[in-house]
C-alpha cells in the first residue's frame, strides 16, 4: 500500500498527496485583491469623492452645483481591440449634475462627460495605450494615534505620542529629561501639554487634575505652565500661546486664535482622519484593549439592572472581557461628562468613559483609564474627547500602563489598494476642478449658465492619465508566465507616493516581522535594493474594509478546549491578544489536543502552554507563505535565502512549447493556473459540442450555446508566446469555473513551468564546475526546452516639413535581392524568413537641399533629379532579431484607425523566433539551484543507468552542501520513485512527505533504498567509482537567454562629445576598456596595444579614419593622432578660465588641429571620398547620353553607385546618418 491519499486537482490531474491536515477552508480567489477593490471603487468610491467635493457654491451663495449620479457607458474598444490599436481599455464616464440658482429658484440638471475611466479586465489588470499594466497595492503607515518610548543617555525612558491624520496637522506629545510633558501643534515649537487642555476650555489646574487624576508628570507640567498675563483668562492665554506658535509675529486675539485652532483640527475640509483613522483612534484609546491584564479598582455593574459584571479586584482576562465588551460599546456605561468654559475651542460638553484599575508596580495605587467614549465612524475630525483620552494614555504610559507602538507592526501599516489609489487620484483632479468651477460661477451669467459650462474636465482626465501612465505604483505587467502575472497582482510595495524611499529605508522596516505570519510571505521578496520593501501577500490573507491584512484561524472552544471548524479572520493587533497553536499540532479525532504541553505563538514569543490556554489554531501550514513559495516542494528543507531565489526563479521561467506538470508538486499549481487569468474557464455547466485550436463551443443545460475563442500566438508583455490550447474534447461534461483551455506554461489545467528530466548529481570532466550545467543533446533534439518568442517592430510614415514619408518598394540604392520578400507596397510578406539587417518595411523620407558630397554629385549626374529627393529610412531587422514573420498589421487614417498626431500610416511587423536550449542559457530548479548551460553532450556520451537510460542533466554535487537547499535531494528521490510507479505526487509545504515517507515511497517503488545507483560512463562503458544520486527533478529554463545577451560591435555609433563608442547592446556599443584594464596593460608593458586601444579603437577621430583607409588599401597604418578626449579636457580647463596651450619640444605653441594634418592631404577627406571623386571625373569625361543608355540597358551603374554609397556610409563614422542609425 502506497503512502498518502489520492487528490484530484481539477478534472484532469490526480496526485497522491502526503498531506495530513484536512483543508477545511478553501483558498480565496487569488486575484480578488485587485478585482474586489476596483468593484468597490465603481460602486462606492466614485460617489464618495463627488460627495466630498460637491456641492460647490460661489462666494455670494447665488449658485450651487450638486452631484446626483454617475454612469459608465459601453467601452469604445474590447480588450483585444485595445491591445491591437494601442488604445486604453476604458469607458466614457457621464456625471449627472444639478445646478440650483437660489435667486430665481431655477434648477438645471444635466449629464456632463467627465472623460474616460480605465476599466479593469476580468483578470485584474488594465490596458493602457495597448500595454497591460498592474496597479500594485501600497503598504503605508495607517492614520491613528501612536505611542513611542526611547531611552535617553541616563537610561530613563522618554515617551512620545503622535496623532497622525490622513490629511491635516499633526499633534505630538513628548516628555523631556525633567519629566515635564510638552505638546507640538503641526510640527511647531513645543508648549507645556497643559496649554492644549486649557485651550479646550478646562482652564484651572483643579479642572485638569479632576479629569486626569494625580500624576507626578502632570504636577511638574502644571508648575511649568505659569499664568503670564493676568488680564487674560487661562483659556484665552492658552489659545493665544498656540496661535503664537502657529503664526509667530502676527497680532492675535482670543477669537482669531480660537478660529485658527478650529480650522486646523475641527474643520472636515482641512482635517481628515478617514474611516481607518477613526477606527484606529477608537481602537487604541478603547478600554477593551487597555483593561486586559489589569485588576479592577471598582466594581462594574449593568447600568440598567445593577447586575454585577465584574467585582473589584477581578483580573480582566479574555473571558471577563467577553462579558464586558458589549457594555464598553454603550453610551451609558461608566461615562463622565466634563463641561468646558465658553471661551474654549468647542464649548460643548465632553463625554468620556472612565474605569479605575490598580497599578502593577504599586499594587494599592489607583489609576484612572479614560477612553474617548463611543465616537461614530463617520466623525472624521479629531474631537476634544480624543485629545483628553490620548493625553490620559500618554500620562499613564509613564506609570507603566499601556503599550508603546511598533511602527513595523502590521496593525499599524495598512494596504492602499487600486480602488483607494484611484479614488485619491480622482480627488486631486476634482479639487483642482473645484477652483475652476468657483471662478466660472462668479464670471458667468447666473441666468443662462449650465453645469456643462462650469465644468472643466481637463484636471480630472489629466490626474487619472498621470496615475496610470507615470505613477510608481502603475507597473508594466510581468507576463513571463502565469505565476509572474499572479504574483505581480498580489504584490505589496512600501515604495511610492506617501510611502518610503529605498534610500531612507533602514533594516527594521525591511526585516520580517512576527505580524507577517499568515499575512505577508517571509520568503518572497526581490534580491537587491528593494529587499523587504516589496512583499507578496500570503495565500490565505485577505484585506478588510480598513485596509488591514487579516489571516484565518480555527477557534478553540473556551468551554471544551477542543478545536472547532469555526473560522475567524484576525488582524495583526487582534492576534496580539491570543495564544495560537500551529496547524501541525497533533489532534485527536474529536478535536482535542493530544499533548499536555503545546508550543504556541504569542506576539513575538514561542510559549509552551497547556491546552486550556489556547485560543486559536492555524488553519493550514501553507497560510504562512505566498503562492510562489507554496509551489516549492520540501520548502521546509531549504535554507531561506535559496528558497527566496527559488520563488523568484519560478516567475522567470519561460513558457515552453510542450510543458509538463511537475511529477513532484505541492498541490498549489492548480489554483495558481486557475486564478492567474491565463486559463480559459467555463462560465456555466454544460457539454462540449465542438473543439478546435481556435474555438470551443459548450451547450449549456438550458440549451444556450457558449462560444469561447482561444488566444493564439499573441505576443505577451515579456515578448513571450501567449498561446492557449484546448483542455477538453467533444462530449466532455464541464462545470462552471472549470479550466477548458490551458494558457502558456500550463498542462492539464495546472501550472507547468518546466520539465521533468532525469538528473544525476555527478561531475563530468569539470564541465559542471561552479554551477555550470551539462545537458544531453536529447533535450535539444526533442524540443524539451524549446520556447517561442515574438517581437514586434513598428514603422511610422509621418508628415515632415519637406513632405510626407512614403511606404514603398522603390527604395534608393537597394538591390532587387533585398526586396524579394516585400509586396507591391514595400511591406514584408507573412511567413518570410528574415535575418539581421533585412528590410521589413520599405520607407523613404524627403531630403532637404544640402551641400552635396562627391558621391552624391556623381549619382545626381547619372540619375538626374530623382536621386536627390529621398533617403532610405526603411525598417530593418535589428541585430539578433531574425526569425519568421508571423503577422503584419497596417493602420491608416483612411481606414479610420486612431493614430498619433502627424502619423499617416503605421505598419507593425511581428517576428517569431523558435529558441532551443543552448550553451549560455540560464536554468534553475525550484530550490534556488541555478546554473548556466556549459556543455550539450551527445546522448551516447552521457552517463547512463544500469537499465540503459541516459541521464538528461548532470549537476555538480558541490552545489548542495554549502547552499543548504536539501529539498532538491528529497525531490529527486521522490521524483524517481514517482516515475517508476507512473504517478504524480503532491507534497504541500510544511505538511508534505517527511524523510521517512520519502524512503518508504522509494522502497515501495522498488528503487535502490539509498536513492543512489551505479552510473556508467557513456564514452567508455565503465561504471563510475561511487554510486551516484540520480532521480527526477523539475527543472526550468529561465528568461535570461544567451541570445538576448550576446553582443559584438563592428562599426557603430560614437558619442557626440567624447567621440568614443557608445556602450550597451541597445546602442550597438563597444566594451568599455576602463581604468583597471589600462593598469593591466601597463603592468605587462604592452605599450603599442595600449596606444591603439586609447586612440584608433576609441576616440582618435582622424586616426581611425586613416586606419580604415590603410586597411582597405592594404597599406601600413599611420601613427595615431590626438584623442578627442584630450581636446575635450583642454576645452574644459579653458572654460574654467585656465590658459592652457600645447607646446612642442622647442616650446613653440602648436594648434591641436595642425597635429592631425598630413603634408599633402586634408584630414576630412578619407579614402572612399577620393575614390568617388576620381570616379566622378572619369564618368563626366564620357557622354551623358551614352551613360544613361548603359544604365538603362544593364543597370550595372546603379549597382556600382550603390556599392560606392554603401562603402562611403560605412566610413563616415561621425556623420549624421551614422548617428541616426
UniProtKB/Swiss-Prot annotation:
Q: Which InterPro entries match?
A: DNA-dir_RNA_pol_bsu_ext_1_sf, DNA-dir_RNA_pol_bsu_external_1, DNA-dir_RNA_pol_su2, DNA-dir_RNAP_su2_dom, DNA-dir_RNAP_su2_hyb_sf, RNA_pol_bsu_bac, RNA_pol_bsu_CS, RNA_pol_bsu_protrusion
Whether Ubl conjugation counts among this entry's keywords is no
> In its keyword annotation, does this UniProt entry include ATP-binding?
no
Q: Which reaction does it catalyse?
A: RNA(n) + a ribonucleoside 5'-triphosphate = RNA(n+1) + diphosphate
GO molecular function annotation: DNA binding; DNA-directed RNA polymerase activity; ribonucleoside binding
* Job of this protein: DNA-dependent RNA polymerase catalyzes the transcription of DNA into RNA using the four ribonucleoside triphosphates as substrates.
Q: Which NCBIfam families match?
A: PRK00405.1 (NF001616), rpoB (TIGR02013)
State the family named in the UniProt similarity comment for this chain: Belongs to the RNA polymerase beta chain family.
Q: What is this protein called?
A: DNA-directed RNA polymerase subunit beta
Which source organism?
Lactobacillus delbrueckii subsp. bulgaricus (strain ATCC 11842 / DSM 20081 / BCRC 10696 / JCM 1002 / NBRC 13953 / NCIMB 11778 / NCTC 12712 / WDCM 00102 / Lb 14)
Q: Specify the taxonomic lineage.
A: Bacteria, Bacillati, Bacillota, Bacilli, Lactobacillales
